[in-house]
C-alpha cells in the first residue's frame, strides 16, 4: 500500500515565488520565505500617466518543499534534509537500533526509516545537545540563525510599508531587529524555545516565545472511529500550507507509530505528540494498568522517530483531583483524565510527577521540548480560573525549574474556556509562576453557546491572550466538540488563528507586523484587485467571493466592487477629491502668480 501523491497540495500560491534567505554565520542555513509579486501603481493626472513599481512583499512560509517547483517531493522518502549539519555533530551518535521495531510492521510501514541519533554519554550534562544548553554555553547554533532570519523577513528592505502604530507589549522585550545573539539569549533565559529534535532533519526550525511573532499549532490525528494514515499526512501538508507553525499528532487509533513516522518524515514544521495516548494503547486502553516502564519506552521510541515536543501531564497530582469534583464539566483533558484515573485507582502520586527527573534525562538526550500539559484546564467558562486549574499551574512552575536544571526547553500549556474578563489573569499568573516560560493556549473559548462556530468563539480569546503574552495558539476548528476535523475544517481553523495571531502581533508592536496590512491597503486604494487577492491570508477565498458577483476579467481592474457600485465607491470618490484638490491648488497658485505680475522672483517687503 502507498499514499496517493496526487492528493497532496503542491501548487504554489498565486503570484508567489519561493525564496531562501542564506545564513551568514552558517552557509548551510536556507530560510524559506514567500515573495508575493505585486503589480505597479498607475497614476493618471491631467492626461499624464506614470507607472511606479511595487517591490515584492516577503511573508513567512511554513509549507516546506511542497510549494517549491524546483523540488520533487516524494512522501515515500520524506522531505529533503533542511538541517544537514545534524549528521556531522560530534555531540551525538547513531544508536544501534530502534526501540520499537515490531511496531513498524502493519498495513503501511514507512519504507525509508532513518537510523536514530542521541547525545553521546560524554556530551550530557553541561555539554549537552539541547538548544538551551548550547545557549547557556554562549553558543549560537544554526537553528538560532535560522529563526532570527525567519523572524526578520528582511523587513529593513521594505521601508515604504514600514509605518506602524505603536504597540502595547505588556512587558515583552521586542527588538527592532532579530539577531542570532538575541535568539540565543532568549533561549538561554527559558523565555523562548526552538523545538528541534536531532532526529527530525527535515525540520525548518521555528521559535516560540512572547518576544517573537505569535505562532499557531494545528492538531490532527487518527481516532479509533475514523480517519487513516493517508488522510492525516494529507492534512499535515494542508495545515502547513495555510500557515501552521507546528502540528500535533494526536492519533489514538491503531498503528499510531506508523502514522507518526509518515507525518514526521514529511513535516517541515515541529511535530508534537501526547505520549500517554500511545502508552494507553499498549495496555489495551486500561488507564490503571499504565506503568512507568511502558511510558518510558514510549517516550524513547517517539524521541527516536523525531518528535520535537511532548505534551506531558506531570502537573496532575493526586491532591488536585478532588478540586475538580464541583466543576460543571469535570476534567476535560484526555491526558488529564487518564492520569487522574490512574492516581485514584492506585491512590498514588502521578508517576509522571515522581519520575519527572528521569523524563528530563530522556528529553535532553534527543533535544525534545517539554509542553507541560494543562490536564486540569477548564472545559466550560463556569469552571474558568478555579482552584484546580491554578493548583496545577503552580506545579507546572515547579516542574519548569526542574526541566531547566536539566537543560530541557520548556513551554506551558494553558486553557481552555475563559470569559474575556478573566483572560488576563491567566497570562499574568503564568508569567509569574512559570518564570516567563512560553505560554501555549487552546483559544481560550470566550463563550460556550456556539457549537459549529468555536473557531470564532476561541479566536476572540486567542487574540486577546496572545496580545497579553501567549507565545503560541493551538487552533480550534468549527468541528470542536462535534467531531474529527476534515481538510476544510483544518483550513478554516488555521486561517482563523493566523488572523488572531497577526492581530496580536499588531497590538504588541511586533517589528514589521503591519507591512502586509499596509501593502493590501495600498492595493485596495489603488484598485489593484489581483494584488488584494494575492496578499490575503486565503487568496483563493478572496478571489472566489469577488467572482460571485463580478466574475469578468474587466472587473479585476474596475474602480468599484459590487458592494457600492461605480457611483458610490468611497475610495473612488476619495481619488476624485484628491485629484480635485490638486487641480484647485494648481489653479490657485497660477492665479497668485498672475496677480503678482507674472514675475518669477518677488521682492520681499523691507519690514
UniProtKB/Swiss-Prot annotation:
Q: Which GO terms describe its molecular function?
A: 4 iron, 4 sulfur cluster binding; carbon-carbon lyase activity; zinc ion binding
Q: Which residues are involved in binding [4Fe-4S] cluster?
A: 561, 564, 569
At which positions is substrate bound? 219, 248, 277, 313, 333-335, 374-377, 413, 440
Question: Pathway listed for it?
Answer: Cofactor biosynthesis; thiamine diphosphate biosynthesis
* Cofactor descriptive note: Binds 1 [4Fe-4S] cluster per subunit. The cluster is coordinated with 3 cysteines and an exchangeable S-adenosyl-L-methionine.
The cofactor required is: [4Fe-4S] cluster
The record's EC number reads: 4.1.99.17
Q: Which reaction is this enzyme known to catalyze?
A: 5-amino-1-(5-phospho-beta-D-ribosyl)imidazole + S-adenosyl-L-methionine = 4-amino-2-methyl-5-(phosphooxymethyl)pyrimidine + CO + 5'-deoxyadenosine + formate + L-methionine + 3 H(+)
Q: Which domain of life is it from?
A: Bacteria
Q: Which GO terms describe its biological process?
A: thiamine biosynthetic process; thiamine diphosphate biosynthetic process
**InterPro entries the UniProt entry points to:** ThiC (IPR037509), ThiC-associated_dom (IPR025747), ThiC/Bza_core_dom (IPR038521), ThiC/BzaA/B (IPR002817)
- Signal peptide segment: none
Top EC class, one word = lyase
Cited function: Catalyzes the synthesis of the hydroxymethylpyrimidine phosphate (HMP-P) moiety of thiamine from aminoimidazole ribotide (AIR) in a radical S-adenosyl-L-methionine (SAM)-dependent reaction.
Q: Which HAMAP family match?
A: ThiC
**Similarity comment:** Belongs to the ThiC family.
Cited PANTHER family: PHOSPHOMETHYLPYRIMIDINE SYNTHASE, CHLOROPLASTIC (PTHR30557:SF1), THIAMINE BIOSYNTHESIS PROTEIN THIC (PTHR30557)
Can you name this protein? Phosphomethylpyrimidine synthase
Q: Which gene encodes it?
A: thiC
Amino acid at each position: 500500500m502507498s499514499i496517493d501523491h496526487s492528493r497532496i497540495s503542491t501548487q504554489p500560491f498565486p503570484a508567489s515565488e519561493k525564496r531562501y534567505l542564506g545564513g551568514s554565520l552558517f552557509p548551510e542555513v536556507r530560510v524559506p520565505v514567500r515573495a508575493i509579486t505585486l503589480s505597479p501603481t498607475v497614476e493618471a493626472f491631467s492626461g499624464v500617466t506614470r507607472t511606479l513599481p511595487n517591490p515584492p512583499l516577503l511573508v513567512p512560509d511554513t509549507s516546506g518543499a511542497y510549494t517549491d517547483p524546483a523540488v520533487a517531493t516524494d512522501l515515500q522518502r520524506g522531505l529533503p534534509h533542511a538541517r544537514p549539519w545534524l549528521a556531522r555533530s560530534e555531540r551525538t551518535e547513531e544508536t544501534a537500533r530502534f526501540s520499537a521495531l515490531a511496531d513498524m510492521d502493519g498495513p503501511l510501514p514507512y519504507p525509508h526509516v532513518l537510523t536514530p541519533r542521541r547525545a553521546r554519554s560524554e556530551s550530557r550534562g553541561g555539554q549537552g545537545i539541547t538548544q538551551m544548553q548550547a545557549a547557556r554555553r554562549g553558543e549560537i547554533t544554526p537553528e538560532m540563525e535560522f529563526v532570527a532570519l525567519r523572524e526578520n523577513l528582511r523587513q529593513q528592505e521594505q521601508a515604504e510599508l514600514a509605518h506602524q502604530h505603536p504597540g502595547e507589549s505588556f512587558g515583552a522585550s521586542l527588538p527592532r531587529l532579530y539577531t542570532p545573539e538575541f535568539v540565543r539569549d532568549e533561549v538561554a533565559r527559558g523565555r523562548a524555545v526552538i523545538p528541534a529534535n536531532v532526529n527530525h532533519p527535515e525540520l525548518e526550525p521555528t521559535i516560540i516565545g512572547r518576544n517573537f511573532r505569535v505562532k499557531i499549532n494545528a492538531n490532527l490525528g487518527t481516532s479509533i472511529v475514523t480517519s487513516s494514515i493517508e488522510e492525516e499526512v494529507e492534512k499535515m501538508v494542508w495545515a502547513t500550507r495555510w500557515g501552521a507553525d507546528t502540528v500535533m499528532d494526536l492519533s489514538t487509533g491503531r498503528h499510531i507509530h506508523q502514522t507518526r513516522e509518515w507525518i514526521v518524515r514529511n513535516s517541515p514544521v515541529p511535530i508534537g505528540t501526547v505520549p500517554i495516548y500511545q502508552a494507553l494503547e499498549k495496555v489495551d486502553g486500561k488507564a490503571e494498568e499504565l506503568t512507568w516502564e511502558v511510558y518510558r519506552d514510549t517516550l524513547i521510541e517517539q524521541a527516536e522517530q523525531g518528535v520535537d515536543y511532548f505534551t506531558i501531564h506531570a502537573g496532575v497530582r493526586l491532591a488536585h483531583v478532588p478540586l475538580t469534583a464541583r466543576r460543571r464539566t469535570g476534567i476535560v483533558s484526555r491526558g488529564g483524565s487518564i492520569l487522574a484515573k490512574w492516581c485514584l485507582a492506585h491512590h498514588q502520586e502521578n508517576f509522571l510527577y515522581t519520575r519527572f527527573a528521569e523524563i528530563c534525562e530522556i528529553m535532553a538526550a534527543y533535544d525534545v521540548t517539554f509542553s507541560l500539559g494543562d490536564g486540569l484546564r477548564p472545559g466550560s467558562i463556569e469552571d474558568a480560573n478555579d482552584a484546580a486549574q491554578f493548583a496545577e499551574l503552580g506545579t507546572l512552575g515547579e516542574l519548569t525549574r526542574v526541566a531547566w536544571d536539566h537543560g530541557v526547553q520548556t513551554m506551558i500549556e494553558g486553557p481552555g474556556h475563559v470569559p474575556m474578563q478573566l483572560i488576563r489573569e491567566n497570562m499574568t499568573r503564568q508569567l509569574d509562576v512559570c518564570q516567563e516560560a512560553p505560554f501555549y493556549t487552546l483559544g481560550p473559548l470566550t463563550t460556550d453557546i456556539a457549537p459549529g462556530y468555536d473557531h470564532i468563539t476561541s479566536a476572540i480569546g486567542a487574540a486577546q491572550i496572545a496580545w497579553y503574552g501567549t507565545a503560541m495558539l493551538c487552533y480550534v476548528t468549527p468541528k470542536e466538540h462535534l467531531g474529527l476535523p476534515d481538510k476544510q475544517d483544518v483550513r478554516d481553523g488555521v486561517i482563523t488563528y493566523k488572523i488572531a495571531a497577526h492581530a496580536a502581533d499588531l497590538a504588541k508592536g511586533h517589528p514589521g507586523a503591519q507591512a502586509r496590512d499596509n501593502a493590501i491597503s495600498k492595493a485596495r486604494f489603488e484598485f489593484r484587485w489581483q494584488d488584494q487577492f494575492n496578499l490575503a491570508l486565503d487568496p483563493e477565498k478572496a478571489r472566489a467571493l469577488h467572482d460571485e458577483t463580478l466574475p469578468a476579467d474587466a472587473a479585476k481592474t474596475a474602480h468599484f466592487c459590487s458592494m457600492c457600485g461605480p457611483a458610490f465607491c468611497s475610495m473612488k470618490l476619495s481619488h476624485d477629491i484628491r485629484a480635485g484638490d490638486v487641480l484647485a491648488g494648481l489653479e490657485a497658485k497660477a492665479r497668485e502668480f498672475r496677480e503678482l505680475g507674472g514675475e518669477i522672483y518677488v521682492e520681499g517687503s523691507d519690514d
